[in-house]
Design a protein with these regions (language model features):
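Acidic, glycine/proline-rich Ca2+-coordinating loop motifs
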Residues: 1-160
Length: 160
């Protein structure tokens, strides 16, 4: 499979022929919130330096959003130096408007309205947000800071 980038957490995925062309397409769901304010108050991406190191070690571009990979089966690409070819896929999640369904768990293609076309159903939700940066508001409070300052922490060396 050849794609320009991929979903980062890849929580759930589903294979379906969404165009009825005999080729299996792939949807992968992730955690991008639909609302901009939630995106901005969440730990969302790696810092640039970590992203750069990952790329130097050969990791592919990863984004925390849903991806819809449309199979372009007639566009076979030959791997140089081999006789192996594979299908190319186009990532159309943003074009299809399904890239941000919040903390998503499982996608399902099914004809829900009996119109003959497959609909995408995504189960999503999370109790509280473990990646929310709202703890910064609480740690600024004096009583919390005083409590943290009064504790004795033991220094433990990190294993090598």
């Amino acid at each position: 499979m050849s794609v320009g980038h991929k979903s980062r957490a890849s929580i759930g995925n589903y294979l379906a022929d969404i165009k009825n062309d005999g080729l299996m397409d792939v949807v992968v769901v992730d955690m991008m919130p639909e609302r901009e304010d939630i995106r901005k108050s969440s730990v969302f991406a790696d810092p640039f330096n970590i992203d750069y190191v990952k790329q130097r070690f050969g990791y592919h571009f990863q984004y925390r959003r849903n991806t819809l990979l449309l199979n372009r089966g007639n566009a076979l690409k030959l791997i140089p130096g081999t006789n192996t070819a594979f299908n190319l896929f186009s990532e159309i999640g943003q074009l299809a408007g399904i890239h941000a369904t919040d903390w998503s768990w499982a996608p399902l293609f099914v004809d829900l309205d009996n119109d003959g076309h497959k609909d995408l159903f995504v189960s999503n939700g999370i109790y509280r947000r473990p990646n929310d940066l709202d703890y910064l508001d609480h740690i600024k409070k004096n009583e919390v800071q005083l409590e943290l300052n009064s504790r004795k922490f033991q220094s433990i060396p990190a294993p090598i």
